[in-house]
From Swiss-Prot:
Phylogenetic classification of the source organism: Eukaryota, Fungi, Dikarya, Ascomycota, Pezizomycotina
Molecular function terms from GO: RNA polymerase II cis-regulatory region sequence-specific DNA binding; zinc ion binding
Gene source species: Neosartorya fischeri (strain ATCC 1020 / DSM 3700 / CBS 544.65 / FGSC A1164 / JCM 1740 / NRRL 181 / WB 181)
Keyword entries, A-Z: DNA-binding, Metal-binding, Nucleus, Repeat, Repressor, Transcription, Transcription regulation, Ubl conjugation, Zinc, Zinc-finger
Annotated protein name in UniProt: Probable DNA-binding protein creA
Zinc finger (C2H2-type): 66-88, 94-118
Function: Transcription regulator component of the regulatory network controlling carbon source utilization through ubiquitination and deubiquitination involving creA, creB, creC, creD and acrB. Represses the transcription of the alcR, alcA and aldA genes by binding to a GC-rich region in their promoter. Also plays a role in response to carbon starvation and the control of extracellular proteases activity.
InterPro entries to which the protein is assigned, alphabetical: creA/MIG_C2H2-ZnF, Znf_C2H2_sf, Znf_C2H2_type
Subcellular localization: Nucleus
PANTHER family linked to this entry: REGULATORY PROTEIN MIG1-RELATED (PTHR47428:SF1)
Record field: compositional bias (Polar residues): 7-42
Length: 416
């Protein structure tokens, strides 16, 4: 049997074998040969890759009207063409509907296969996604709580009218935010902190030196208002006022700052000039402090000399021989003074030079106004003709000394 016989099993030689099998028994060898031929034909389609079953041959002849405009492929159905075009364009219209999943697919069967991951409770990917979502939610909640606690701890005390009242029990814990009544907050500071008590919880609760200085200034102001009404004992901060060897107290520091500035309740202004101050109860502190005003004598002169000039020092002016006294506190400006005080001339007082004093010789303006250039010369200074009393007079001292000590004045005297 040749290869052509295998491809064409329905040849005329094999057709009579079937009737012979039914009619008589002597045709048994032909029947066995025909069975071997059918077995070879049944095994042939798996061996031949290009061959198709006989029942699919009519589909190969069906028309393919739906052709891809981007390539040479054609399809029987429109949805097949549409699905194929998405491979060229990259369109993925099928999105996953599971919350938190952002995957998209171009085919609906891919979406169905992907949805089984979320629907299967035993999936490792599903458990991992749930753990990640829970961890992200917990981290966001912790961050919100931390921001809220920081905002509450850094909240300044409210600026309300101050009234004396007893402390309330709600301010017993240092970890809570400042209470609604500032007087209760001041009473809590007066009763629980003690004279310069070092509390380890103060740093963790956000109560920095600004809040303590404000509270101490309130206590000091209340004690100062009731000082003239009757005899009062020394309060808890009073022991630091009369000891000049120690650093000034916190309440006196706050009062000295408030006396030179306006008594407004602007917390930004109150905090701006206390930022770089060191802790007053530190024994090794070297930061300069402001002058401390005692209760017994509210004199304009401080109890001790500061290491640096405060920001509210009086404006500089030339001093004479008869007055070496600073102005009183009432003459100081109550407004916010700049860091560098401007040097403004102040005409009042007997120690300043006045233009009413007599001049010797022509003035500089008269010399410069002369038309002739040869006459524009400075006259020879007549120093020997001035009396000794005029040199020692307070009105002439500042002018003559400044003119004689200057380099330009010495050059003019040597020139002539």
């Amino acid at each position: 049997m040749g290869f052509s016989d295998l491809l064409n099993p329905q040849n005329p030689e094999s057709t009579p074998s079937t009737p012979a099998n039914k009619s008589s028994a002597p045709s048994t060898p032909s029947t066995g040969q025909s069975n071997s031929n059918m077995t070879s034909v049944s095994l042939l389609p798996p061996l031949m890759k290009g061959a198709r079953p006989a029942n699919e041959e009519p589909r190969q002849d069906l028309p393919r009207p739906y052709k891809c405009p981007l390539c040479d492929r054609a399809f029987h159905r429109l949805e097949h063409q549409t699905r194929h075009i998405r491979t060229h364009t990259g369109e993925k219209p099928h999105a996953c509907q599971f919350p938190g999943c952002t995957k998209r697919f171009s085919r609906s069967d891919e979406l169905t296969r992907h949805s089984r991951i979320h629907n299967n409770p035993n999936s490792r990917r599903n458990n991992k996604a749930q753990h990640l979502a829970a961890a992200a939610a917990a981290a966001a909640a912790n961050q919100d709580n931390a921001l809220a606690s920081n905002a509450a701890s850094m909240m300044p005390p409210p600026s309300k009218p101050i009234t004396r009242s007893a402390p309330v029990s709600q301010v017993g814990s240092p970890d809570i935010s400042p209470p609604h009544s500032f007087s209760n907050y001041a009473g809590h500071m007066r009763s629980n902190l003690g004279p310069y008590a070092r509390n380890s919880d103060r740093a963790s609760s956000g109560m920095d030196i600004n809040l303590l200085a404000t509270a101490a200034s309130q206590v000091e102001r209340d004690e100062h208002y009731g000082f003239h009404n009757g005899p009062r004992g020394h309060h808890i901060f009073g022991s630091r006022h009369h000891n000049s060897n120690r650093l000034p107290s916190l309440s006196a520091y706050a009062i000295s700052q408030n006396m030179s500035r306006s008594h407004s309740h602007d917390e930004d202004d109150m905090y701006s000039h206390r930022v770089k101050r060191s802790r007053p109860n530190s024994p090794n502190s070297t930061a300069p402090s402001s002058p401390t005003f005692s209760h017994d004598s509210l004199s304009p002169t401080p109890d001790h000399t500061p290491l640096a000039t405060p920001a509210h020092s009086p404006r500089l002016r030339p001093l004479g021989t008869s007055e070496l006294q600073l102005p009183s506190i009432r003459h100081l400006s109550l407004h916010h003074t700049p860091a560098l005080a401007p040097m403004e001339p102040q005409p009042e007082g007997p120690n300043y030079y006045s233009p009413t004093q007599p001049h010797v010789g022509p003035s500089i303006s008269d010399i410069m106004s002369k038309p002739d250039g040869t006459q524009r010369k400075l006259p020879v200074p007549q120093v020997p003709k001035v009396a000794v009393q005029d040199l020692l007079s307070p009105g002439f001292t500042s002018v003559s000394s400044s003119a004689s000590n200057s380099v330009a004045g010495g050059d003019l005297a040597d020139r002539f």
